[in-house]
């Protein structure tokens, strides 16, 4: 790998630790099931226990990446951009979800599913601004945005379906991000003794 390509791979390394996105995606799904009072997730403490379990899985996955691919500290400006995009995305998701469809008096009450629609657009913007926009980002996040913003979501509140859609998209994106890091840096290496 030439030095320019290595610098680029190192800069994106932190943002391509895709398998961490699998427990995050599962959290979206568990939240939707909890909102629906499904089975054991009807109990709030079960949700908390699952949250702790998923945090443990994410920690283990992060440790896997540290041990097999090393650790890279992103440049301060790139990290600031990532944090800024994350905060802006959260504000947009909250605000636009209320504006597009909610019980608020000022809601437009459109027949859309704003959670996946806005989340897909936000993640597409995040991928373009912080990581390098790749074809799988366009397909996954673009499809999620289109599916959420199609005016076919009349009837009951589709928020929990939207959370499940987001969870599946996050996990799929994570798998493709992981494959990108494997293609770029090679398969996971075993630590050597000595």
List the predicted regions and their residue ranges:
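Terminal transmembrane helical module of multi-pass membrane proteins
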Residues: 128-194
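Helical transmembrane-bundle signal
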Residues: 25-31, 54-55, 91-94, 123-126, ...
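Membrane-proximal helix-loop-helix units in multi-pass membrane proteins
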Residues: 87-147
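Hydrophobic alpha-helical transmembrane segments of polytopic
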Residues: 17-27, 47-51, 119, 162, ...
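Selected alpha-helical membrane-embedding segments in polytopic membrane proteins
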Residues: 21-101
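Membrane-helix interface and helix-disruption motif detector
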Residues: 36-48, 98-115, 152-165
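N-terminal juxtamembrane cytosolic/stromal segments of multi-pass membrane proteins
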Residues: 1-20
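Alpha-helical transmembrane segments and their membrane-interface exit regions
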Residues: 52-60, 117-128, 166-179
């Amino acid at each position: 790998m030439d030095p320019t390509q290595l610098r680029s791979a190192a800069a994106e390394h932190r943002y391509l630790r895709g398998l961490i996105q699998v427990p995050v995606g599962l959290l979206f799904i568990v939240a939707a099931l909890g909102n629906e009072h499904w089975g054991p997730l009807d109990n709030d403490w079960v949700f908390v226990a699952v949250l702790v379990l998923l945090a443990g899985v994410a920690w283990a996955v992060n440790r896997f990446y540290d041990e097999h691919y090393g650790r890279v500290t992103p440049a301060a400006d790139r990290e600031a951009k990532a944090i800024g995009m994350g905060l802006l995305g959260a504000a947009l998701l909250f605000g636009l979800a209320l504006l597009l469809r909610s019980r608020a008096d000022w809601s437009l009450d459109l027949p859309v599913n704003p959670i996946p629609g806005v989340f897909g657009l936000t993640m597409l913007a995040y991928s373009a601004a912080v990581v390098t926009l790749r074809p799988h980002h366009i397909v996954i996040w673009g499809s999620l945005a289109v599916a959420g913003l199609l005016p076919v979501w009349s009837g009951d509140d589709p928020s929990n379906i939207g959370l499940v859609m987001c969870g599946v998209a996050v996990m799929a994106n994570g798998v493709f991000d992981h494959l990108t890091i494997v293609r770029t840096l090679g398969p996971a290496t075993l630590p050597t003794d000595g």
